[in-house]
Each structure stands twice: as C-alpha cells, then as structure tokens.
Amino acid sequence: PWLVGWWDQFKRMLNRELTHLSEMSRSGNQVSEYISTTFLDKQNEVEIPSPTMKDREPQEAPRQRPCQQLPPPVPHLQPMSQITGVKRLSHNSGLNNASIPRFGVKTDQEELLAQEL
C-alpha cells in the first residue's frame, strides 16, 4: 500500500519536471518525450504538452489533436544523439598511455614499488 502511494507521488513529481522541461525549448520537449516513451510503462502516465508556437520550426504545420488522444505507436525510439541540442560524446581525453605511470602513481622508486606490489 505505501509503495503505491509513493509511486503515484513519484509520477506526479516526474510529470511536473517533464512538463517544465518540455516547455523550456524544442530540445527539452524532445528529451521529455524520449524519457516518457523509454522509461514509463504506459504512454499516458505522463502528459507532455506539445511545443509552443515559438518553439516550432517555421515549416511545421500546427497539429490539431485532442489532449486525451494517444499518439500512434512509434516503431523505434529516436536515439538521444539525434535530439536537437544533444551532441555525440567524443572519447578524446587529455590522457594518453605515456602520461599514466605504470602503477598509477609517480615515483622515483618504481622498481621497489613493483617488488612490493
């Protein structure tokens, strides 16, 4: 019983946060839709508003759809890297193998450390 109450409270809080995120920008709306379709059991657990007119691209025609109608099933989910404003992670780091000491610490007595380890 307490778990059901907790879950309802969590869904309300998540709904508030996703609504706020979706109202901030077009990419925020895309992220909200991705989170709700990926991690929630039912499509209608969290209601995400459509983007405002200023967030829509100029060529996009306004959609006339009642709020209660469920969207059509999506054949596959959109990857996060294709959401506007989310950039692909690059794995270039400032570290290279030559700059990392053999045992993870810099020491003048590396052979003595090797014997101890």
From Swiss-Prot:
Cofactor(s) the protein requires to work: Zn(2+); Mg(2+); Mn(2+)
Keyword hit for Phosphoprotein: yes
Example GO BP: cAMP catabolic process
Disordered: annotated span: 42-79
Pfam family, one: PDE4_UCR
Top-level taxonomic group: Eukaryota
Quaternary structure annotation from Swiss-Prot or TrEMBL: Interacts with LYN (via SH3 domain). Interacts with ARRB2.
Pathway terms, separated by semicolons: Purine metabolism; 3',5'-cyclic AMP degradation; AMP from 3',5'-cyclic AMP: step 1/1
Name this protein carries in UniProt: 3',5'-cyclic-AMP phosphodiesterase 4A
GO function terms (MF aspect): 3',5'-cyclic-AMP phosphodiesterase activity
UniProt feature, compositional bias: Basic and acidic residues: 53-63
Keywords attached to this entry: cAMP, Cytoplasm, Hydrolase, Membrane, Phosphoprotein, Zinc
Mode of membrane association: Peripheral membrane protein
Localization annotation: Cytoplasm, Cytosol; Membrane
An annotated GO cellular component: membrane
Enzyme Commission number, as recorded: 3.1.4.53
Catalytic: annotated segments: 78-117
Organism from which the protein derives: Cavia porcellus
